[in-house]
Amino acid sequence: MNAELRLRLSVGLLSAAVIGYEIGLTRLFSFLQHYHYTFLVVSGAVCGLGLGAALSAAIRQGTEGLGRHLGWWAAFCASSMGLGALLLATFPRMPLLLMVAVAGVPFIAAGAFLALVFRVRHTESQRLYCWDLVGAALGILWIVVALEWLGGVAALISAGMLALAASVLLAERLLARLTMLGLLVVLVVALLVARDGAIDLRALAEAADKPMFRALGSGPDGRSTGEVVDTRWSAFARTDLVDRSGDTGLNLYVDGGAGSYMFRFPGDYRRLFFLRREAAFFPYYFGKRERALIIGPGGGADVLYALMTGWRDIEAVEINPEIVDLVRERGDYNGHLYDLQGVDVHTGDGRNYLQRSDRRYDLIALPLVYAEAADLVGYALAENYLFTRE
């Protein structure tokens, strides 16, 4: 493989790694912090890339000397991605500014790498930019799959492996290649460790600033009050199934918040008679009880309310496919709630579903629209477009 092709491939690989790392960080920050902090990732990425480019301008060498730096900048980017992911997972309650600094180092390295590439090969900037864009596009496709298969932390480490592949392509000496291959082995081991769940949930439980973290906190006797039964990562969110007692049901959380309940349902409605005291049960007593639409059913509590009050046709639209999968996989626990006769569950956005549908409903329920209202007190006066046409 000639040097020009190796350089172009390395640009594509590093671009894929950086965009994938950035998207993965938004998912991790959304879980560790509140969702509005994810916008900080985009600002931090742009800032880091700019700082890296400015840093590269301070390097005063000829074209050949600059070329020798490229592989090491890519290796630095790769190692900082892997190390940063592990630090964020191991110390999830570190100060926010420190968290941003740890997450931002790879962008500085990537900014320096790309600036040096275009400086060394300025006559081929159009071709290199094409490889940059193609790599970024493929990186977006790859990170969606990586998040689902590997999870949030391991997906970030796999981004480091892509960046390391770029550095290996640019390594000219045997010792440099061996060093980078050794770093690759370290990243593979870190990925395997993170694959089983590397985030320190105990530290998050001590913070107790999200519903899920409070559910995992300690009771009066010092024992944990909740246990994570299952975890799913996706490009949409992290979804956790938490067992707090196991007597009446399980809790579902999206990015640590937006909690919903999956009741234990043996098929006998008399066992769930206590639900009639719930305030959310009240609307289902009214109307013709023929066709109901539930937007955001979560673990299926509102589906149960509709069934218990005798509604004939129940349609539910859940935007998070992981929740639907978790409910269906635990059909023996919840009485196969989403597959009962008269219950039709769809995955998608509720507003779009209503726009496409020409049906009319006797009741439209939105149980999870304000699920995090208690945690977002500061946003009580913010605009909300959920009930508008646009």
Set out the residue ranges of the language-model regions.
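Alpha-helical transmembrane segments of multi-pass membrane proteins
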Residues: M1-E390
